[in-house]
Amino acid sequence: PAAAPANDPEGVELAYETVDWTPPEGARLSDAIYEEYALQSLRIPGAAPHPTKLVQSAAMASVAPPKPSYRPMLPADIRTRLSNAQLETVIYAGEAHVDHLAGAWMVDEHLDNVSAAAEDAASAVRFRRGFMLGDGTGAGKGRQSAGIILDNWLRGRRKAVWISKSDKLIEDAQRDWSALGMERLLVTPLSRFPQGAKITLTEGILFTTYATLRSDDRG
């Protein structure tokens, strides 16, 4: 079945405040391997703590992350759908994505060869910075990923690719996208299209696997 017409929620910039974090007076690096995780460089009014306990290494807990300035565009009720730790991820991902990597590049017509170019060269492109999410089990990486896509979606960037290790995990991706108030069928499997055929979607999240990307065109 085709995805129903999207009835998108209205996007609003997520309100938060940055804070100067200092370790508690008299605190010292503990002998423990892990410390309980808490937001250090920002506060998100109205956001709930994560429903399960999160931890981080004691060394990481002793240093606050840099203060962000990026404000994601998200539904007004997002605080009821994502925890403060998950919203923090969406903020820092956006902080990375608004910037570019150094240098300019030429990409060939097949999109598989890249070479350095002068920044003022005709047809030169720049690449956006990436963001690596290294959270472990229980942090809700699916919902965090969906939140990052939703931020872009509500800014008008309505095409995304979701790559996973198994095609069976599309149900998880659809669940996480739907949990943010979006139409689950907007997450469309690449397997719906013949290999090598043009993908005609005007908007949506194309779900595929690493194995599919490695396979040859059968056309």
Indicate residue ranges for each PLM-predicted region.
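SF2 helicase/translocase NTPase motor core
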Residues: 11, 16, 21-29, 48-82, ...
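Eukaryotic nuclear, charge-biased low-complexity tracts
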Residues: 30-40
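Acidic, low-complexity intrinsically disordered tails
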Residues: 1-6
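Walker A/P-loop-proximal flanking segment of P-loop NTPase domains
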Residues: 80, 88, 92
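Phosphate/ATP-binding catalytic cores across multiple sugar-kinase/actin-like superfamilies
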Residues: 92-103
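The Walker A (P-loop) glycine that initiates the GxxxxGKT/S ATP-binding motif of P-loop NTPases
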Residues: 135
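Motif I (Walker A/P-loop) of helicase-class P-loop NTPases
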Residues: 139-151
